Amino acid sequence: MRPEDPVARAWALMEEGRFKEVEALLQGEPSPEARFALGYALAFQGRHAEALALYRGLYEETGSHRAVHQVGMVLRMAGRLEEALAVFEEEARLLPPDPLARSTNLYERGYTWLLLGEEEASLAFLQASLTEAEASSDPL
């Protein structure tokens, strides 16, 4: 990590749970990557409305399925589970043919179904997530 790279520094701070410092570091940073990281920091501070607005704006600007994914994640964190599930379904339609991206989406859907108390649906999505993860080249 280059010390002058604010996004890399922000992710290092987030790993330590230093979200307010991340926010201070990234305020005013214009790049989409900086705003993705800022949204994450906001969400983990419980500032869901701000994070949602940021990620929805990023989706309008970039069309990135990552932004849609983050909207779903923040909705889930805010306890808006049915809305989160609908967003993850929308994201699934936008995904590239990439096993890791599909695995991540399937995991989110499985986890959200679990939070909704639907264990059978959850298990099906989590098993599909594992299958996709095993097909990816990601070592995790």
Residue positions per predicted region:
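Amphipathic alpha-helical segments of tetratricopeptide repeats
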Residues: 30-31, 59-60, 89-93, 128-137
